[in-house]
């Protein structure tokens, strides 16, 4: 971190209005040299640590509801669009595990909270994101010309704020008493971690993962099913320890992150003049220049990855495969790195891959086969 500054560069040289966060500069917009950064990152990491007590239970409980919805839709319509049911599942799961709140204590939040976050996220990222819904010149004129005001979502965001304020007392006291945050700072940062980092990240990544598996016709499902059931024996044996023994499951998760990183662009500004080297060249970087890392390009480096344009499910299996984790940068750092209060690596780096692996293992304890793509599921065959 001595070479680059991460101040206000989450999505480049554009920062959404602080009105989206109640006027608070949340942790993601702080550089590591700013005093509040260590406190907020520490709060996020401790919140994740404490959530481990209920993480698996809440994940599987909400997956039960999700898959029940999907099965019902398939029986009625012959197929099920799963994006919105999955987002509702993710929201409910994260409220319970991160904030320690059952979303159902507020019927309005349980029904509409995830929709509010979708709008809140969209208003922040649309000014710089390529959507592809209209021809590019029109997209630039119509969508990328101005920032969107937080006023458009302020009322519904306030409902989420009040929901956390009224129900997440234990988590908020952690931020206040152990990390010296004001209650408002704790609420705004918890909402950002829950809504932007976790919910937003999972909403992008998990459909890619599910789509890879459900759309595969190479025999991958049979291989995963065999591994999961060999390790688990029965559904009651799925836990953090057993899922870590599933080399193929974890490799599929890593390979999906390599192909489809949830945050494809990462930015930083040079603190000083320095040189940056590639395999065959050296580039001069001047102080103050904004640097952009395009992850899909970085993680398809032919000097590192064999056949980088091919999706290889078992790429990370074995000792040789595990060495490639040094070059898996989806989390703003290598998969072998360690998030800390002094760096900007994703605090949930390990819990993201663990959660995705648990989802895959849970899927193949429920079903023998599943057919679909990144947006819909067409058929499931229940485990015999």
Curated annotation (Swiss-Prot):
One of its GO terms (cellular component) is chloroplast envelope. It comes from the Eukaryota. Transmembrane segments: none annotated. Keywords: Heme, Iron, Metal-binding. GO terms for biological process: fatty acid metabolic process; response to wounding. Induction: By wounding. Signal peptide: none annotated. InterPro entries: Cyt_P450, Cyt_P450_E_grp-IV, Cyt_P450_sf. Its cofactor is heme. One of its GO terms (molecular function) is heme binding. It holds the Pfam family p450. Expressed in roots, leaves, flowers and siliques. Heme binds at residue 346. Gene3D superfamilies: Cytochrome P450 (1.10.630.10). Belongs to the cytochrome P450 family. This is Probable inactive linolenate hydroperoxide lyase.
């Amino acid at each position: 971190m001595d070479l680059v500054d991460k101040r206000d560069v989450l999505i480049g040289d554009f920062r959404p209005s602080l009105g989206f966060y109640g006027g608070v500069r949340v942790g993601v917009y702080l550089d590591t040299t700013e005093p509040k950064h260590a406190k907020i990152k520490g709060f996020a990491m401790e919140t994740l640590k404490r959530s481990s007590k209920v993480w698996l239970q809440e994940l599987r409980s909400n997956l039960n509801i999700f898959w029940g919805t999907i099965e019902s839709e398939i029986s009625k319509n012959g197929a099920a669009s799963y994006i919105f049911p999955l987002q509702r599942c993710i929201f409910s799961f994260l409220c319970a595990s991160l904030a320690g709140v059952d979303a159902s204590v507020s019927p309005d939040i349980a029904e509409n909270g995830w929709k509010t976050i979708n709008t809140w996220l969209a208003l922040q990222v649309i000014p710089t994101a390529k959507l592809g819904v209209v021809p590019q010149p029109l997209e630039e004129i119509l969508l990328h010309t101005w920032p969107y005001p937080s006023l458009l979502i302020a009322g519904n965001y306030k409902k989420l704020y009040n929901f956390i304020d009224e129900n997440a007392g234990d988590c908020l006291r952690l931020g206040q008493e152990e990390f010296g945050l004001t209650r408002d700072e704790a609420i705004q940062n918890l909402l950002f971690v829950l809504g932007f980092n976790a919910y937003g990240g999972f909403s992008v990544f998990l459909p890619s993962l599910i789509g890879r598996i459900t759309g595969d016709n190479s025999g991958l499902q049979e291989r995963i099913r065999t591994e999961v059931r060999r390790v688990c024996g029965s559904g009651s044996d799925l836990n953090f320890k057993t899922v870590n023994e599933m080399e193929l499951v974890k490799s599929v998760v890593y390979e999906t992150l390599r192909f489809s990183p949830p945050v494809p662009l990462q930015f930083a500004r040079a603190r000083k003049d320095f040189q940056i080297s590639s395999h065959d060249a050296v580039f001069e970087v001047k102080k103050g220049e904004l640097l952009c890392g395009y992850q899909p390009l970085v993680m398809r480096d032919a000097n590192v990855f064999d056949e980088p344009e091919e999706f290889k499910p078992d790429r990370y299996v074995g000792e040789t495969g595990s060495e490639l984790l040094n070059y898996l940068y989806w989390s703003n750092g290598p998969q072998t790195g360690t998030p800390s209060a002094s760096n900007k690596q994703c605090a949930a780096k390990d819990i993201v891959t663990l959660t995705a692996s648990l989802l895959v293992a849970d899927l193949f304890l429920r079903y023998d086969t599943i057919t679909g793509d990144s947006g819909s599921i067409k058929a499931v065959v229940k485990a015999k």
